[in-house]
Regions:
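GST-like domain detector, emphasizing the conserved glutathione-binding G-site
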Residues: 1-133, 227
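Short, hydrophobic secondary-structure boundary micro-motifs
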Residues: 78-85, 107-108, 160-163, 188, ...
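Acidic/histidine-enriched, glycine/proline-rich intrinsically disordered or flexible terminal extensions
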Residues: 213-228
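Residue-level detector of family-conserved "landmark" positions at structurally sensitive sites
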Residues: 29, 62, 189-190, 210-211
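Positions that flank functional sites
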Residues: 34, 165, 215-216
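Short, flexible helix/strand-to-coil boundary loops that buttress conserved ligand/catalytic motifs
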Residues: 44, 63, 108, 154, ...
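GST-like fold's C-terminal all-alpha helical module
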Residues: 100-202
């Protein structure tokens, strides 16, 4: 299989974590969605990453990829599958994963990546230039209540959606990881969230993400530190 992705697209990071947790064999291929390659648009007319190619069959979208992998590789994890069998438990996993893929993305991870990473590669004509300070301030303000929500969830259960690891944890960690790279997560404001993220960073599936680098923009001091 091949995953078309962007290293700092949080949805792509989620797909990478899901594939790794299910011990699926896959290769990575960088995709610049701004170029709108006709070949890529044939695979995903929405023009967004990630897209998983299973042979010639395209699977588009982070959540769709995760559930596809669960259905095709679930026997690899047995009772430790990341999408529970119980319908109510599955609904809670999907709800929290959706919170990060939708709400957190719009309010935090997308503006941070756009302003601090993507603009570095763009000319002024393409929308590049200095970061929009108001957008960054809003994202940094928003992340605080998201972090408090993570902390509250963890005060009621062992993992974000249940008593064991699920796609909800992978989604939250994927989105928080890009903010963590940029040094924009106030970990000191939630001990529960910090301890949970330390567990996530220590998982073998997370190691490739911690090796990702943005040319000209080094990671925060704690990004690859498992005992931050």
């Amino acid at each position: 299989m091949k995953l078309l992705h962007h290293a700092f697209c949080p949805h792509s990071r989620f797909a990478r974590l899901a594939l790794a947790e299910y011990r699926a064999s896959f290769d990575l291929a960088d995709e610049d969605v701004r170029k709108r390659r006709p070949e890529f648009l044939e695979l995903n007319p929405a023009g967004t990453t990630p897209v998983l190619l299973d042979g010639k069959f395209p699977v588009s979208g982070a959540s769709v990829i995760a559930e596809y992998i669960d259905e095709t590789h679930g026997t690899n994890l047995g009772e430790h599958r990341l999408l529970p069998a119980d319908p109510k438990a599955r609904a809670e996993v999907r709800r929290i994963a959706g919170w990060f893929h939708d709400k957190f993305y719009v309010e935090v991870s997308e503006p941070l990546v756009r302003e601090k990473i993507l603009k570095l590669r763009l000319s002024s004509a393409e929308g590049g230039g200095p970061p929009d300070s108001s957008a960054l301030q809003a994202a940094k303000k928003n992340i605080r209540y998201h972090l408090q929500y993570v902390g509250w969830l963890l005060s009621t259960r062992s993992w974000l959606a249940a008593e064991k690891l699920s796609f909800a944890d992978l989604a939250a960690a994927a989105h928080l990881s890009v903010a963590d790279y940029l040094g924009d997560v106030p970990w000191d404001e939630s001990e529960n969230a910090k301890n949970w993220y330390a567990k996530m960073k220590s998982r073998p599936s997370f190691r490739p993400l911690l090796a990702d680098l943005v040319p000209g923009l080094p990671p925060s001091k704690v990004y690859a530190d498992l005992d931050f």
